[in-house]
């Protein structure tokens, strides 16, 4: 972090850096700036990240602000998309399931159609939580169940498909995923009155395998909503984090 921050601050040249926006994965105390994660950034669990960043940069602690990485993604997607959506839902699909609800460019953690805390990863679903059904873990387990082949991540499935191996199995898995993802999202899209759904994260690289089915699942329920892929998730997250300091 020290090296990366130093390089960024050097690029600013003579321009004064008046704030620092940081996007972090949950769980994290975004008010106090305390790391809490067991499995992500475990080496800094309990650390006052705000204090450490102040020590490294000299930036006023009151101007070092934190947000959830999924919230950063949503705010960045809204900004990079021209800010035309009034009610935008952003989701990141990969090793986890991040979500955010954006109202006129602002991150919403409560309100009509917004889940508690504005997050969906732990939303109760089929006796478990939503993340269990839309993360890469689900793909790994489903592919192993069907084919007997162990994989890590989704990319090996795509590679098999392009090598004309397990093509029917891969298609069936993505079809099931699209239906399940639509089932999770539909009530929130409807109650929130979303006019755009933006999808980012590692899974978006496989959009051709599930976006058409996802759109069709929404249309079958009478929901017409643009489903947009944000391939450069990192840039969107950084843009959203930077927006905290405006």
Where are these regions (language model features)?
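ATP-binding/phosphotransfer module of carbohydrate and carboxylate kinases, centering on a glycine-rich
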Residues: 1-19, 28-32, 53-62, 78-89, ...
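General beta-strand structural signal in soluble alpha/beta enzymes
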Residues: 63-69
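Short glycine-rich anion-binding loops that position phosphate/pyrophosphate groups of nucleotides
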Residues: 25-28, 94-98, 203
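Short beta-strand scaffold segments in enzyme catalytic cores
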Residues: 90, 97-102
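A short acidic/small-residue loop/turn micro-motif
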Residues: 43, 114-117
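A charged helix-plus-loop insertion that forms the helical arch/lid used to bind
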Residues: 33-46
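Short beta-strand-to-turn element immediately C-terminal to the catalytic PLP-Schiff-base lysine
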Residues: 76-77, 100-104, 108-110
């Amino acid at each position: 972090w020290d090296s990366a921050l130093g390089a960024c601050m050097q690029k600013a040249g003579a321009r004064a850096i008046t704030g620092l926006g940081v996007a972090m994965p949950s769980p994290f105390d975004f008010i106090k700036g305390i790391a809490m994660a067991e499995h992500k950034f475990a080496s800094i669990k309990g650390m006052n990240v705000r204090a450490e960043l102040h020590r490294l940069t000299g930036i006023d602690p009151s101007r070092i602000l934190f947000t959830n990485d999924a919230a950063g993604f949503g705010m960045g997607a809204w900004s990079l998309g021209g800010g035309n959506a009034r009610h935008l839902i952003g989701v990141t699909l990969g090793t986890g399931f991040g979500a955010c609800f954006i109202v006129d460019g602002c991150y919403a953690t409560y309100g009509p159609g917004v889940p508690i805390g504005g997050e969906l990863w732990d939303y109760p679903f089929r006796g478990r939580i939503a993340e269990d059904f839309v993360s890469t873990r689900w793909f790994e387990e489903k592919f192993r169940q069907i084919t007997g082949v162990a994989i890590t991540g989704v990319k090996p499935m795509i590679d098999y498909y392009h090598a004309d191996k397990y093509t029917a199995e891969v298609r069936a898995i993505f079809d099931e995923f699209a239906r399940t993802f639509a089932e999770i999202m539909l009530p929130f899209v409807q109650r929130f009155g979303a006019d755009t759904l933006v999808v980012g994260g590692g899974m978006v690289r496989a959009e051709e395998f599930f976006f058409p089915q996802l759109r069709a699942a929404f249309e079958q329920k009478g929901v017409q909503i643009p489903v947009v892929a944000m391939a450069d998730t990192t840039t969107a997250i950084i843009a959203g984090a930077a927006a905290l300091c405006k």
